[in-house]
């Protein structure tokens, strides 16, 4: 942290070296599939794919084209924005990730239809081929995850009940930064207005 913290943009030139080092470290025991996140992870996965043929998924999370638009980037401020955020490298990495990914993971149809259809991504993937996308909405599949409490669950429940009371409804865990676009207020509102919850 502090003055020793490096922004991720400063690490971009080292991603090919990271991939080479990773392949050397794991030689002979490579995975069958890679999951990648954000532009830098997608780029590293694409480099790995080109060297090994190992397919990968790409989850963009926060795409550069939307950030570029949100920040109001124009021809007048492009140089300062580029120097700070390295948009040209990020957008190129996202386009490469989209092109070579076996699957692109999104959480909503809107994300697929609007964010990935941004003009800066048009030639990176076939906008009409929705089979490349996998929509995985936020939440937990209760058919997969056990509802039978373990001993550690019971201990934790006692601690949480002491703090929050014993209403007995389902717990919702939110793990994200406090950002308006994460719609945490909408989650709290939906939870508080539903009598079953």
What are these regions (language model features)?
Residues 1-197:
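Catalytic cores of nucleotide-sugar-dependent glycosyltransferases that transfer UDP/GDP/TDP-activated
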């Amino acid at each position: 942290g502090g003055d020793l913290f490096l922004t991720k943009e400063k690490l971009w030139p080292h991603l090919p070296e990271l991939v080479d080092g990773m392949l050397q470290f794991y030689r002979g025991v490579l995975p069958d599939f890679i999951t990648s996140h954000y532009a830098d992870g997608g780029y590293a996965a694409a480099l790995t794919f080109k060297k090994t043929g190992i397919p990968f998924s790409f989850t963009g999370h926060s795409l550069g084209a939307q950030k570029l638009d949100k920040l109001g980037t124009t021809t007048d401020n492009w140089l300062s924005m580029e120097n700070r955020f390295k948009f040209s490298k990020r957008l190129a990495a996202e386009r490469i990730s989209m092109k070579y990914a076996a699957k692109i993971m999104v959480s909503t149809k809107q994300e697929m239809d609007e964010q990935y259809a941004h003009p800066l991504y048009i030639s990176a993937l076939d906008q009409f081929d929705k089979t490349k996308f996998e929509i995985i909405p936020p939440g937990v599949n209760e058919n997969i995850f056990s509802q039978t409490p373990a001993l550690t669950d019971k201990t934790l429940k006692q601690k949480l009940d002491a703090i929050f009371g014993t209403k007995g409804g389902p717990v919702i865990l939110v793990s994200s930064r406090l950002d308006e676009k994460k719609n945490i207020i909408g989650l709290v509102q939906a939870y508080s207005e539903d009598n079953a919850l």
